[in-house]
A protein has these predicted regions:
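Active-site neighborhood of divalent metal-dependent phosphoester bond hydrolases
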Residues: 6-86, 105, 111-125
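Catalytic phosphate/metal-binding cores of nucleic-acid and nucleotide-processing enzymes, i.e., regions
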Residues: 49, 65, 99-102, 134-137, ...
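Conserved beta-sheet core of the metallophosphoesterase superfamily
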Residues: 128-194
């Protein structure tokens, strides 16, 4: 998630993803910035906070984009998945979930792309997984893969795996790196700090 609002090329990124999925089987997850970009493209009045967190660059990038192209981008954003649960009980989502019984019971779909409490919980728990007080949310899935909350907040630009939650957001939306991870081996690759690419 968060294909939008990061830097100055949101329309080009969305065009690339739309074309790429025609050549390669893809599963795209919804991020909070994608949801916000959709609102902007639909004409909603956006607030200052959005503009300060990448929205200003998105507004500028869309100034000369045709209505037809904007519609294609809205359709693409509408097609994004909130989460993916694979056959090995590994959960992939942008941010987290809050329901103690898991994703199937989440009452507010926005939590999949706005929640930070899952990562905060994973970072704060020191109990062994076998302890009866170990948080249920961290026991439901074999592995959980998220982004949304940069690992740079914990002083590193590397992905972190804590209590079964792998966070691969290494701050690309700010001055960090873009990271991809092989979920089988946990090997990862990173870009240069993204701001150096512009």
């Amino acid at each position: 998630g968060d294909y939008a609002d990061g830097w100055s090329e949101t329309p080009e990124v969305l065009d690339f993803l739309i074309e790429y999925q025609k050549k390669q089987r893809c599963l795209f997850l919804r991020g909070n910035h994608d949801a916000l970009c959709r609102e902007f493209l639909l004409g909603k009045e956006m607030d200052t906070l959005w503009r300060l967190h990448g929205g200003k660059a998105t507004e500028k990038a869309y100034r000369n984009v045709s209505a037809e192209r904007k519609k294609a981008h809205i359709d693409f954003i509408n097609s994004l998945e909130n989460y993916y649960l694979d056959s090995k009980n590994r959960l992939f989502l942008h941010a987290g979930f809050t329901n103690l019984r898991g994703i199937a019971h989440e009452h507010f779909e926005q939590m999949y792309y706005w929640d930070r409490t899952l990562w905060e919980l994973a970072c704060s728990v020191s109990l062994p997984k076998t302890d009866k007080y170990y948080p249920n949310r961290l026991k439901l899935y074999n592995e959980i893969y998220i982004g949304h909350t940069p690992t740079t907040r914990l002083g590193t630009d590397k992905p972190l795996i804590i209590n079964g939650v792998a966070n691969v957001d290494t701050g690309a939306g700010f001055k960090g790196r873009l990271t991809v991870m092989d979920i089988e081996t946990k090997q990862y690759w990173q870009s240069e700090p993204v701001y150096k690419l512009y």
